[in-house]
Each structure stands twice: as C-alpha cells, then as structure tokens.
C-alpha cells in the first residue's frame, strides 16, 4: 500500500517536474504484479477461463525464459461478477492490497467503466479492457495510462447493420439490448445505420445483466413482425435469445449480434440453438483446426497446459498480453507506467488474430476492421472480407 499511497500523495509534485525516489507500485527488483477482474461468478463466467488462461500462458512463457529485465510476472485475478459494485471491491483490493502495476484484460463494459478512473488516477496502467471502449475512455477522461483494444461498438454495429440492410432488405428491425454501457453504445450504431436508410426501430426491449429469461423480449419482436433482430448480448444472453427464437419456430427472422456474442464459446454452449446466427466482429475466429500452422500449434500447446477447450478469446487474451509484455521489455530496467505507455504509443504490433498490423492512435487500437460471419453447420463462416 505504501507505494500506491506515495504515488497518490506525490502526484502533484511529480506533475510539477520535481523528481522523487518513489518506485512504481507493483514493481520490485524481482517481480512485476499485474491484476485483472473477470466475471468468475456471473452470466459470462463460462467464457472467463479462456481469458485468464490466455493471459497466464503468455506470462508463464516470459517467466520461464527468465523474466523481463530480471523481473518475473505475478498475476492476481479477482471476480467482478459482471457487476459494477463487485468491480469496485475488486479494484480496491488490487490497488491497495496487491499494489498492482497494471490492470490487464479486465472484462465487462459496466465493471470497467465503474473503476477505470480510480485505477488510472492512482497511477496504474489500464490495458486492453474488454468492453465498450468509447465509454471507458470517456469515464477515464482519456487518461494517457488507458489503452483500449476493443473496437468501438457503435462503429462496428453501424457497419454490420448497414450491411445486413443492404444484403437482406429487412422491412422492420428490432433491437434487444443489455441495459447499461453495452446496450447504449451498440444502440447508437444501430440507430445511425437505420437513420441513414430512413428507418427506425419497429420494436426494442431491454434486459438486465444476469437475466436468464428472454421470452418477453423475443415475444415483443415477434408481435412487431420484425425481419431482423439486432442483439446487444454476451455469451448467455446470445444463446438465450436464439433459443427463444427457435422455440417459436420463427425461421424467417435474422438475428445479428456484435463482438461479445460472436465467439466460439457461444457455439460450444449454444449448439443447434445458435445455428443461423449472424455476428459482426473485428478479429479472426480461429479454431484449433483452422488458421496458420503457428496458430494450430498454439492451440495444441494451450490444450496440453489447461483443461478447458481453447478458443479465439484465449488467443486474443494471449495476443493482448504479449503486446503488454513487449512494452514492459521495451520500457527497460527502470520500469515506470509512463515508459510503458510511451512504448505502446510509438510502436506497432501484429498477431495472426488481427486483420492488420495495429498501432495505438490516441491510445486506441487502429485500424478497426469489421467482418460479418454466420453460424453454419456449427461453425462461424465468413460472409464478407474485412471492411474498414
């Protein structure tokens, strides 16, 4: 706690250009402490082992190679249950008790928005939060210590809905959304796409994080006789809504989800219920049997190391963590958050899961590509090439 308190109390002195001897919180001669908060007990818990293990795999590789600049990584994982209030408790422990150097790969739009400003104000790097980037950035007042990698949900939903309208000519469009940052931001993109076509929602229905019954929301769409349902959903909600559509025998409606619902875990858990689902997203959906040979080898190594099945979320968490490890390496022995931030701002990064080499433009991932996929025969199948 002492280093974190020193940072808070001396922030004004440092900002004034007066040198201090305080070291970075979470950094000792032999160790760098990283933290994250994930949904370990809530509606998205089934997908969290992939994110946690993907991170741990890359950190273990760095540690097995002797560490970075003489230091090894230690990862502390806390539960946010997809609830902002749980995230507040988690971040308090990570900052005060564990004194983490950085928060990496934290999950959830609402949980991240609830705590990001507290973290950066106390000098912790906040890297690659999984959630609504523009809302998280706004909450953090565009802090130089925040680096967002999740594409802007409004932008990608605008592109995805526009493509669906142009391709399938739906007469009526409905929107089912999670109340909070996720649904609000995705909804902005949906409304923009509809307005450009002279359209508006034929029906809309919200749900709360943690809800498991979506019969009333789907019934509202059915009553409005929509041709396309756009859903702002994560894992369980995506499957639940599709299951309701199938139960009604509603075969002539199309359903489009965004990045959080366009995942391999949705296929594993949803099975036949998600057949025909459309998804719009911004990274490649590799499987253990698809992709280039290095990716196949990575999946095989993951399966040897962990008990759960690997998916693209594990690979994505690994790729993000790899970027962070490289930035720590590039920052040098005298490690500070500012030096890591400078490295991230001035270098580019590549990985097979990304559609292109990535940079941080204004501390946000750039460029943002979008691809439309559909579940066919139990697998995500590309319908488009990556689009900007």
Walk through the language-model features, giving the residues of each.
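Signal peptide-proximal N-terminal region
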Residues: 27-29, 53-75, 195-199
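Short, low-complexity disordered leader/linker segments with a strong preference
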Residues: 1-33, 386-388
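Beta-alpha junction/loop-to-helix N-cap segments that form part of ligand/metal-binding clefts
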Residues: 33, 46-53, 65-139, 207-214, ...
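Extracytoplasmic ligand/sensor domains, especially the bilobed periplasmic-binding protein
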Residues: 99-203, 254-278
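Extracellular/periplasmic periplasmic-binding protein-like sensory domains
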Residues: 245-318, 330, 381-387
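Hydrophobic alpha-helical segments within soluble ligand-binding/sensing domains
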Residues: 87, 148-172, 213-215, 238, ...
């Amino acid at each position: 706690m002492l280093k974190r308190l020193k940072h808070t109390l001396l922030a004004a002195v440092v900002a004034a250009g007066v040198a201090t001897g305080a070291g970075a919180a979470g950094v000792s001669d032999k160790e760098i402490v990283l933290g994250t908060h994930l949904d370990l007990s809530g509606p998205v818990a089934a997908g969290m082992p992939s994110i946690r293990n993907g991170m741990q795999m890359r950190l273990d590789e760095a540690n097995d190679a002797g560490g970075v600049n003489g230091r090894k990584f230690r990862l502390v994982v806390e539960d946010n249950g997809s609830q902002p209030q749980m995230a507040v408790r988690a971040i308090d422990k990570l900052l005060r008790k564990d004194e983490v150097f950085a928060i990496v790969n934290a999950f959830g739009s609402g949980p991240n928005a609830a705590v990001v400003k507290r973290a950066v104000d106390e000098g912790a790097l906040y890297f690659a939060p999984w959630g609504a980037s523009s809302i998280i950035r706004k909450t953090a007042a565009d802090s130089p210590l925040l680096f967002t990698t999740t594409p802007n949900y409004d932008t990608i939903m605008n592109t995805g809905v526009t493509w669906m309208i142009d391709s399938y000519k739906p007469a009526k469009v409905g929107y089912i959304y999670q109340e909070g940052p996720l649904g609000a931001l995705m909804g902005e993109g949906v409304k923009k796409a509809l307005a450009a076509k002279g359209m508006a929602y034929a029906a809309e229905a919200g749900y709360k994080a943690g809800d498991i019954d979506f019969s009333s929301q789907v019934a509202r769409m059915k009553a409005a006789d929509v041709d396309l349902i756009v859903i702002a959903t994560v894992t369980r909600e995506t499957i639940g809504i599709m299951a309701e559509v199938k139960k009604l025998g509603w075969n002539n409606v199309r359903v489009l989800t965004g990045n959080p619902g366009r995942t391999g875990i949705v296929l594993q858990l949803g099975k036949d219920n998600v057949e025909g689902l459309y998804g719009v997203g911004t990274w490649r959906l590799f499987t253990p049997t698809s992709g280039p040979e290095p990716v196949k080898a990575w999946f095989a190594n993951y399966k040897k190391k962990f008990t759960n099945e690997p998916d693209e979320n594990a690979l994505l968490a690994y790729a993000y963590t790899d970027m962070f490890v490289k930035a720590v390496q590039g920052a040098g022995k005298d490690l500070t958050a500012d030096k890591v931030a400078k490295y991230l701002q001035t270098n580019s990064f590549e990985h097979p899961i990304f559609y292109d080499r990535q940079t941080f433009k204004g501390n946000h991932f750039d460029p943002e590509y979008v691809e439309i996929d559909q579940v066919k025969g139990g697998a995500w199948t590309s319908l488009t090439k990556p689009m900007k």
